[in-house]
Amino acid sequence: MKKEVILNSELAKIADDLGHTDQVCIGDLGLPVPSGVKKIDLALTRGKPTFQEVLDIYLENILVEKIYLADEIKENNPEQLKILLTKLSADVEVVFVSHETLKLMNHDVKAVVRTGENTPYSNIILQSGVAL
């Protein structure tokens, strides 16, 4: 469920349409997008916008109950993981899956948001919560 305002119309539409347990992926510039899944390409140049910048906007604007991350981020991008985890509220469930599983999960997300991030395993699936 949406909490605030996003200026990008495609991002706003996805946030508006998220229901409880719906998912959206924010990915680095190399993450493949499955055929038939909406792709919102925000990449301007290598590194812009960053994964963290786009994640911040979504965390400010949607209620997240669960996230999925590639297990490989622990060894291959620990700094990105550390920063990311500090942004989550204590009640957000964190689930680690293989990178291959994360890519397969993208077949069922509402959209994949492509950033300019060029560090490994900077991909996350956000699962929408509900404010009751």
Curated annotation (Swiss-Prot):
It comes from the Bacteria. Its EC number is 5.4.99.62. Pathway: Carbohydrate metabolism; D-ribose degradation; D-ribose 5-phosphate from beta-D-ribopyranose: step 1/2. One of its GO terms (cellular component) is cytosol. It is an enzyme of class 5 (isomerase). InterPro entries: D-ribose_pyranase (IPR023064), RbsD-like_sf (IPR023750), RbsD_FucU (IPR007721). It catalyses: beta-D-ribopyranose = beta-D-ribofuranose. GO terms for biological process: D-ribose catabolic process. SUPFAM superfamilies: RbsD-like. GO terms for molecular function: D-ribose pyranase activity; intramolecular lyase activity; monosaccharide binding. It is found in: Cytoplasm. Keywords: Carbohydrate metabolism, Cytoplasm, Isomerase. The keyword Calcium does not apply. HAMAP family: D_rib_pyranase. Belongs to the RbsD / FucU family. RbsD subfamily. Homodecamer. NCBIfam families: PRK11797.1 (NF008761). This is D-ribose pyranase. The gene is rbsD.
